[in-house]
Amino acid sequence: MAETKKGSESYPIKTIVVLVQENRSFDHTLGWFKELNREIDGVMKSDQKFNPGFSSDLNSHNVVFGDQSQYVDPNPGHSIRDIYEQVFGKPWDSGHPDPNPGPATMSGFAQNAERKMKGMSSAVMNGFKPDALPVYKELVQNFAICDRWFASVPGATQPNRLFIHSATSHGTTNNERKLLIEGFPQKTIFESLDEAGFTFGIYYQCFPTTLFYRNLRKLKYLTRFHDYGLQFKKDCKEGNLPNYVVVEQRWYDLLLNPANDDHPSHDVSEGQKLVKEVYEALRSSPQWNEILFIITYDEHGGFYDHVPTPLDGVPNPDGILGPPPYNFEFNRLGVRVPTFFISPWIEPGTVLHGSNGPYLMSQYEHSSIPATVKKIFKLKDFLTKRDSWAGTFESVITRNSPRQDCPETLSNPVKMRGTVAKENAELSDFQEELVIVAAGLKGDYKNEELLYKLCKKTCVSDASKYVTKAFDKFVEESKKARERGGDENDIVFCVDDDDDHNVVKPPPSQSEPSHATPWSN
C-alpha cells in the first residue's frame, strides 16, 4: 500500500472514507430521530405527515407516516417515472409530458406504491424508530448528520452512484447497456487524486461497482482494489489506509453471506452490522484522528420523505440530456437521503442543514463528495459544473483538537428478518447492471442470448457466482497483461476463457452516451 499523503494544512483530515448504502429516504431511516434531537428536520407524532391515498381524489383517505418499519419486503418503485409521481403527486403522461410539473408536493408516494402493489403504501409510509437502528442511534448522538442532502438524480441507483465519484452520470437515467459494457468515460475523483499524488483504495465484498467507470479498469489501477475481508481491518490496524477509501457492499442476498447494502428486501440489520464493523475498525486505527467517515444512500428507494426536492438552480453537469421519453435535463435533484459525518473533529449531536454556497441555490447532494475532496486536498480542477455548484461540508469539522470520548464500539443490531435469504429470487435492476458489467469484462457481452439469460433468467445466487468469477478472471488477466509489459493505461477484458492470452484493448468509445434500449421483461 502506498504511503498516505498529507492532506491540506487547512484541515486535519488525511483520509476520507465513503460508504454508500442503498435505497432508503431520510424520513424512512432518520425521520423519527427528531425525538432524540429536535434540531433534525424529521417527523413527530405531534406534527403528522401524510399522503392522500390518491392525490387526484378529494375523497381519498390519508395515509399517515408511521414509525413501524422493521423488515421491509416489497421493493417500492424508484424509476424516474415513479419518482415523478411521488414528488409531484401525478403520474407521468408520456403522451403529454409536462415541462413545468409545478411544486414538489411530495404527495404521490402512497398512490404510486398502491399502483405498484395493493398494500405497499404501508411499507412506503413508515419509518424506523431510533431503537430499531441502534448503530445509527449512536452515530446520530455522537457525530453529525445532514438533513438537507439530496440524491443527485430523481432516478435509480446507477446514475446516482455515478454522480458520487464523478459529479455526472454521463446522461444516463437507467440501464445503459452499451455504456455498462464499455465503462462510463467521464473523469472521476479517483483520477484527480492520483494526478495530484494522493492515494485511493476500493475495498470490495462483491463485484466492485466502481468498475462502472471505464478509467478504473486501467491496468495502473488494478492494485487499488482490495478484498474487504482480507485487507480492510488489516490496513486500519497497521495505519495503511489511503487518502480516499471506498467501502463496497455485498449486493446479492445469500444464505451464508446476506446482502448488507440495505436495499429492500435485504435485512437492514445486516447493513447496521457493516456500518458497525467499518466504524470500529476505523476507530481502532492509528489513523483515527485523521479520518472523516461519510455514510450516505444512493437514492430514496421509493420511500416517503416530506422535504420538497430542489427544482431550481440545479446545473446540468456536462450538457448531456437523458434519453427519451423523459429527455431529462439533469436540472433538478432527487429525494432527500440520510447522510452521516463521523470524525473525532466533529461535535456530538451536530446537524448540518442547508448549504452555505458556493452559490445562492447550492445544495448538498452526491456531487458534494468530490467537491469537498477537492477542497480538503486542494485538487486543481472540478470534474463538472455540478460539483463546482454543490455545497461542500468541510464546515462540519469545527473542533481545534480531536475528541477523546468517541465510542470505541457500537451496539449490536438485532436481526429483523424472520425468514432466510431468497437465493432463487429474480434480479433487481441494479443486480442486472452488475451482471452486464461483468459480462463486458468477461467477454460474454457479444453473446446476446447468453446476456439475456444472465439478466432475465438467472437467480440471485447464480448471478453472484457469475459476477465473482468474471471479476476474478478480469483481475487474473489484467495481472498477466502487466507481467507482459502492457501499457498502464490499457483497459483489458477477456474474450475466450480457454485462451491464456485472451486480453485485448477495447476500442475507444464515443463521448456521447449510447442510450441503448434495455430488454423488457
Curated annotation (Swiss-Prot):
Residues 478-487 have a biased composition (Basic and acidic residues). Induction: Slightly induced by inorganic phosphate deprivation. The keyword Cytoplasm applies. InterPro entries: Alkaline_phosphatase_core_sf, Phosphoesterase. Belongs to the bacterial phospholipase C family. The lineage of its organism: Eukaryota, Viridiplantae, Streptophyta, Embryophyta, Tracheophyta. PANTHER family: NON-SPECIFIC PHOSPHOLIPASE C4-RELATED (PTHR31956:SF28). This is Non-specific phospholipase C5. The keyword Cytoplasm applies. It comes from the Eukaryota. One of its GO terms (molecular function) is phosphatidylcholine phospholipase C activity. GO terms for cellular component: cytosol; membrane. It catalyses: a 1,2-diacyl-sn-glycero-3-phosphocholine + H2O = phosphocholine + a 1,2-diacyl-sn-glycerol + H(+). Non-specific phospholipase C (PLC) which assumes minor PLC activity during inorganic phosphate starvation. Can hydrolyze both phosphatidylcholine (PC) and phosphatidylethanolamine (PE). Required for normal accumulation of digalactosyldiacylglycerol (DGDG) during phosphate limitation and may contribute to the conversion of phospholipids to diacylglycerol, the substrate for galactolipid synthesis. Specifically expressed in flowers. Disruption phenotype: No visible phenotype under normal growth conditions, but mutant plants accumulates reduced levels of digalactosyldiacylglycerol (DGDG) during phosphate limitation. It is found in: Cytoplasm, Cytosol. Residues 511-521 have a biased composition (Polar residues). GO terms for biological process: cellular response to phosphate starvation; glycolipid biosynthetic process; phospholipid catabolic process. Its main location: cytoplasm. Its EC number is 3.1.4.3. Residues 478-521 are annotated as: Disordered. Keywords: Cytoplasm, Hydrolase.
